[in-house]
Amino acid sequence: MASSEAPPALASGPVAWIRENLFSSIPNTVLTLLALYVIYVIVPPLVQFAFVDAVWSGTDRTACATEQQGGVQPNGWFGACWAYVGVYGEQFIYGRYPDEELWRVDIVGLLFFGALIPLLIPSAPFKRENIIFISVVFPVVALVLLTGGHFELNGFMPTGFLFEPGMVKFWVDYLILSAIVVGIAYAIARASDKDPMPGMRGAAIFMVGIAIIMAIFAVDFGLEHVPTDRWGGLLVTMVIAVTGIAVSLPIGIVLALGRRSHMPIVRFFSVVFIEFWRGVPLITVLFMSSVMLPLFLPEGVTFDKLLRALVGVAMFASAYMAEVVRGGLQAIPKGQFEGAMALGLNYNQMMRMIVMPQALKLVIPGIVNTFIGLFKDTTLVLIIGLFDFLGQIQSSFTDPTWATPVQALSAYLFAAFVYFVFCFGMSRYSIFMERRLDTGHR
């Protein structure tokens, strides 16, 4: 008679998962115990500070100060001062934007997220309409609402000896610029032995579109003008991050293609652009754009400080994005290019329909990682006097009304939570898209 044996170990369920993933070997067991110890050391005090001992209401520093500090809390109390965050919450989001005009910022936010969310949902309809709205219509509407519109259009070319600064000079200069752009399109087409008409037509349509947008900016909509130096908080962070993300991806794609181009001039300028911006710290870029650039401009020509920061951040991010996209292009097998050419596709069709979709699919993690880094790098604009979300929080520390030992800790914890929500959201969506597009190779 066979001897009885113990039943086999549980092969499914939480106990089996814990045994397999956390205590499967001696090194895993040591790492698990070490992680549990770190969690025990960090999480309970954090929960105690942020929730259990936190102060949720109050009108001044006395609500978040101990009796020895002139407050109402017992000596030895140590908790978050969410009352202070609640009082300054509006300033953390809008900066010094006029209170009576905050509805304009709210509308811009609703329009942006209202168009972005359906665009991110794969099954949502009207994708093309959403893309057109968020890439063409929304920037115009947002700029008019946030600034008030009614921009003064002056000339930007050395034609002052013919016209006085004003609307007429601007449109004359714009016609000259349009002719130059169309001429460049013609020269590029001729150098590539292609029909110049499609390129010239596209350049002309593009310049006409820009002219329509500029005409809209010049219209007086009756809105109060709000200069960008009154913007701040999360508004500035979102403006810089969204602009940088929206601009860096298409420019990065063009630069990546240019660096792989067989035309020496295109490849040379693409390499120079990428290596220059990659070799300079972002702080230096912001400092140069804000302090040094105005010194090289003609007298009377100025650019808004926020605009200079937007250009610097966008160019900086574009260089890194170009290398991410180039990595995806290099990962595409040569057979994909040969198959596309065998089908009779030209270069543009091959890149648009065959190569680029596969390349972008492969580098989704790198693209989103660049976006996350760009979002966090917006905090550097404080060095040039722009008060982004973190800068606006730091500026509130000078208010003696809420000066307590826990003021800065509460504010930085709130800032960390906000940044985590945005960055974690981008990370999770990246994982979702990877799984949906099946970027793995079996």
Positions of the model-derived regions?
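Transmembrane alpha-helices and adjacent helix-loop boundaries
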Residues: 2-442
